[in-house]
Amino acid sequence: MFKMLNPRRFYHAVGKKKFLEFILLAVFILFFYGPLLNMLMVAFANEYNVPSVLPQEWGFKWWGYVFGQKSLVSSMIQSFIIAIATTVISMIFCIPAAYSLARFQYPGRKVFMLSFLLTNAFPKLGIYTSIAVLFYKYGLMGTYAGVIIIHMINSMMFMVWLPSSAFRNVHRQQEEAARDAGASPVRTFFKVTLPMAMPGIAVATLYTFLGSMEEAQGTMLVGLARIQTMPVAMYGIVLDSSAIQIGAVFAILLIIPSALLIFVMRKYIGPEAIAGGFKMK
């Protein structure tokens, strides 16, 4: 076994092609998982002085510090409330629009679809600043409504394009078969079309929820100091301290709900559901 650890012996044992594949895989794993492992290490380090490879002392000192902040619990609650509200409202407005774009042909349809890409085509800070000026005029600054609208603007591309692709992939013959069996258009939609399009809708919902949970710039600008979500609270606490462990602890706290949601919805998440959403027909 230990002889196989010799690089030269390993190279001759597996061959040149397999050896190169192993090296590329090792580099990829190091590149992908290295920062995550470093973050975990730093989060549980009571004392850590760069450039030391390992912490000088392990423990939960900085976890206690973070959970001792009064703003943490309220910011977590606000993050979940805003993310859920953003996801639900986006579905109410965007799913019908996605179905319309998938099933009907009308003048300006492609231009309308491309318009949903504009929010991701320009620097977000510039868009947020322009929207903030408009919100100030209508009294939406520092309100939940203003923050939710900002979060919805970021999610509209996913909530329209991905479900639209999912609806296009539902064959009309299946809907017509349900209609021939006596189902009404509404019943056909909820019993046939919607369940078959659910993988694409689930992926869009996931992107919307996670995007809302992680949105910081728009929340800080529109929410002012009144609305503190987790990313906003993280910025404030991290800037008040020079300890890098605080940032690592907050990063883990932000990752946990995202990882749990991805695990729950894993059966709906596939490359075809994601890639298919960015094809215009």
Give the predicted meaning of each segment:
Residues V50-L54, F60-K61, R109-K110, F122-S155, ...:
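Membrane-interfacial helix termini and adjacent extracytoplasmic/periplasmic loops
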Residues F44, K70-S100, P185:
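Transmembrane alpha-helix signature in integral membrane proteins
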Residues K3-K16, I84-F116, F189, K267:
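Transmembrane-helix boundary motif in ABC transporter permease subunits
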Residues V42, E47-V50, L125, T129, ...:
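Non-cytoplasmic
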Residues M1-M39, I255:
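N-terminal signal-anchor/first transmembrane alpha helix
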Residues Y11-K18, F60-K70, S212-A273, K281:
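Interhelical loop and adjacent transmembrane-helix boundary motif
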